[in-house]
Regions:
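Non-catalytic surface loops within mature trypsin-like serine protease
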Residues: 226-228, 474
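Active-site loop/helix belt of alpha/beta enzymes
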Residues: 61-72, 228-367, 435, 461-464
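A charged N-terminal "starter" segment
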Residues: 2-202, 207-220, 255-257, 261, ...
Length: 480
């Protein structure tokens, strides 16, 4: 099968190139007096290569499942009861809540406290600051099924990158129209899977992906991912994904020749973006790409502004990014936004997930070593979590977690080193940290730990499985 696909791809590419060149040559020898319009001829070089596909002019609009999107929302009591969610008022801080669960849980196992109220607050903040952009939650960030269902209840749609993620969302929503298959590179079998499950919105960034889509999902609604400036981001993606602006016309021409349906453009400024300007500049690129698409006869109905939104307003505020996105929509797509010709969507992950999780861990081992150069002791602690579990984010997401002792006292702090529970010497959570003296069995906690932690952890290294105990709460919200 793979050999046949390769041969077919090469054949299609050869045919496309030959037909395009042939059409260009024909246009060159046409006498100007016989041409109705020179500019019209230039704009339609590829129009007659293959007869116009009906799908390019019909059934091109994307209608996502309607929700009361501009209305502030919360989760109803039925949902909270379904998952035995414990309610807390705003007078309770993390210490009080952790203490409640420690009293109930005498196990040595690590556990997460997940505040679903943070999801509601984030959602309402989004629609207040960026009402013209519909969020499609990036499932890869945290695929916890309760979080996914909570987001679905609020009307959030979903960005999926794999068959498993698609299956999970269909199981929860029973509505494949709420999914964008946003991975630009997909196995042929996964494209077939998307087609058989009515997942029609696919992202691509190369002609080879177009060839696969032509074979296995020819009626898909396609979004071309652009490579944009991601130099202000902690995790940069455009070295791997995205087509440059000067490649757009060629790719769209191939799509038109193959009778594929282009409906929009997407971009990703990188995860952990520290400046709002890349969003604005990328929207300017989308404007140029949209103009090229219109010239070729495509009806553009989606602009996907990707992810990169902060979960915690620490190094940059979400509001600053939202304001700049709104500026870009106004400056480059004001008419299309006003008449709802184009739907703007985004792929937030950590924005929704990061603040929801607090990880509670404890000390399972300890020893004291001496730094002869500095003539001082170093306390070495071993915890019941590590970099093969939730703390993988230290390497994979460039995250620097803050470990807080639960029994915090105003006492002398000592240089400390913290290891995870595996047998690997690189399982280091903190190399040099100041902590008070801790005893075996004492608890620590990490706040804002819900993004790219469990989702990227190793499944079973050394036989240690990822943390699987979750305590759900709902804090600081008025219930229906």
């Amino acid at each position: 099968m793979s050999s046949g696909i390769k041969e077919y791809n090469e054949l299609i590419k050869t045919i496309v190139n030959d037909m395009v060149e042939q059409k260009k040559n024909e246009n060159r020898i046409i006498d100007e007096s016989e041409s109705e319009s020179e500019s019209e001829s230039e704009n339609n070089v590829y129009q007659d290569v293959i007869p116009e596909s009906k799908t390019q002019t019909q059934d091109n609009r994307v209608s996502f499942t309607e929700t009361k999107y501009t209305e502030m929302k919360t989760l109803d009591n039925g949902f909270l009861q379904k998952y035995d969610v414990k309610l807390y008022g705003s007078d309770k801080d993390n210490y009080d809540i952790i203490n409640d669960f420690l009293q109930e849980n005498q196990s040595e196992e690590a556990f997460y406290i997940i505040d679903l109220g943070e999801i509601v607050k984030s959602y309402n903040n989004w629609i207040r600051l960026m009402p013209d952009v519909k969020p499609f939650y990036a499932v890869k960030c945290n695929p916890n099924p309760v979080i996914l269902e909570a987001l679905s209840e609020l009307g959030v749609n979903f960005d999926c990158a794999s068959e498993k993620e698609i299956r999970n969302i269909i199981d929860i929503t029973n509505d494949p129209s709420r999914i964008i298959f946003a991975n630009p590179i997909k196995m042929s079998s996964k494209i077939r899977f998307a087609r058989s499950n009515d997942v029609d919105i696919l992202v691509f960034d190369s002609e080879y992906e177009l060839f696969k889509i032509k074979l296995f999902h020819p009626n898909a609604k396609l979004i071309l991912r652009l490579a944009v400036d991601d130099s202000h981001s902690i995790c940069r993606f455009n070295c791997k994904f995205g087509s440059k602006l000067n490649e757009v016309e060629e790719l769209l021409t191939i799509a038109k020749t193959l009778r594929l349906n282009i409906i929009g453009f997407s971009f990703h400024v990188g995860s952990g973006c520290l400046s709002p300007e890349p969003f604005y500049n990328a929207l300017a690129d989308c404007r140029q790409a949209t103009d090229i698409a219109i010239k070729l006869g495509f009806d553009i109905s989606i602009i996907d502004i990707g992810g990169g939104f902060p979960g915690v307003d620490k190094k940059i505020r979400f509001e600053d990014i939202a304001n700049r996105v709104n500026d870009g929509i106004r400056d480059f797509f004001n008419e299309e936004n006003s008449n709802k010709k184009i739907q703007f969507i985004a792929e937030p992950g950590r924005y929704f997930a990061q603040k929801t999780h607090t990880l509670v861990i404890n000390v399972i081992g300890k020893k004291v070593v001496y730094d002869e150069e500095r003539n001082e002791k170093i306390n070495v602690y071993y915890l019941n979590e590590g970099t093969y579990g939730s703390f993988n984010c230290i390497q994979n997401d460039h995250y620097e977690p803050t470990l807080l002792p639960f029994n915090e006292q105003k006492e002398t702090c000592f240089r400390s080193k913290i290891f995870g529970q595996s047998c690997d010497s690189i399982d280091v959570i903190a190399n040099d940290i100041l902590l008070p003296e801790l005893a075996i069995g004492e608890s620590l906690y990490v706040e804002n730990f819900g993004s790219y932690t469990l989702s990227a952890s190793s499944a079973n290294f050394n036989g240690f499985t990822p943390t699987s105990k979750f305590k759900y709460i709902f804090k600081d919200q008025v219930q229906n």
